[in-house]
Amino acid sequence: MPDPSQLNIDRSYPGRWTITFNNPPINMFVPSTIVELGALMTGLEADPSVKVVVFESANPDFFVAHLDVAQAAERPEVLGLWRDFVLRLSATPVVSIAKIRGRTRGIGNEFVLSCDMRFASRQNTLFGNPEVGVGLVPGGGALEWLPRLVGRSRALEIVLSGDDFDADIAERYGWVNRALDDGDLDSFVDTLARRLASFDRETLAAAKAQINRFGTPTAAEIQSSNDLFFPMLALPSAQARRARIRNIGYGIPSDFELNFGQYLPTFGRADDETNKQPD
């Protein structure tokens, strides 16, 4: 399988693939990313020698910034492709590990949630699902994974606030396996991946399948959130909020993209001022 343009694939270590996201300038997911991830899954499923896959980013500031909503709106079928990808990733015999540095929001967070294990840089990771703050709801698995991993109340805090959460809080909530000092992250994940790659694939697959019995989202559950996403995208309130973020740095290297969660409450205050009745 040729290496797709946004996914650099390293197959040099026996039994292990390392996938590096590389879509400058801020590692946004676009429709072609999702298509390439589907092709990647086909390759993983077809190669009986692969036991573990590690996902990382070429950009230390952005693991995955979020979805490019404008491009996705032109290809609404991509959410169905995304649903299929995350379900396949959860079900495949290959063990998936997310090695996380940088901002990991929206579909980026939904991606790491669908991985089997998540390890994050303590100094350089922020997680979030900011969709509610821009007039949407998460449509790619966050609403299904978060309650299973962190519980209902914390899932509500994460989704309804749209705020950014650091790696230490994510570890405390059960969102990630561990928060590690940035200097230790690479060696820890490498050691774990090598350990897993030394075991029998059939045994790893059987253990993963048995654990999956106790809680992975179904296609119908994720589809339910998919079905809300594009209708909400068309709402005037959502369009107005997206117009504001486009004007302050959405989709480009900017303070807004670095600190997305901090900006969201300002949109609500702007609505309050607009709707205020004159004395």
Q: What does each of the following model-derived ranges do?
A:
Residues 32-36, 81, 88, 188, ...:
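Charged catalytic carboxylate motif
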Residues 19, 55, 68, 111-113, ...:
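Hydrophobic/aromatic residues within transmembrane alpha-helices
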Residues 1-14, 60, 162, 166-167, ...:
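C-terminal alpha-helix plus adjacent terminal tail
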Residues 35, 49, 57-88, 104, ...:
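Glycine- (often His-adjacent) and acidic-residue-rich active-site loop
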Residues 40-43, 81-93:
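Catalytic-core regions built around general acid/base machinery
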Residues 1-56, 270-279:
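Conserved CoA-thioester-binding segment of acyl-CoA-metabolizing enzymes
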Residues 88-201:
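Crotonase-fold acyl-CoA enzyme core
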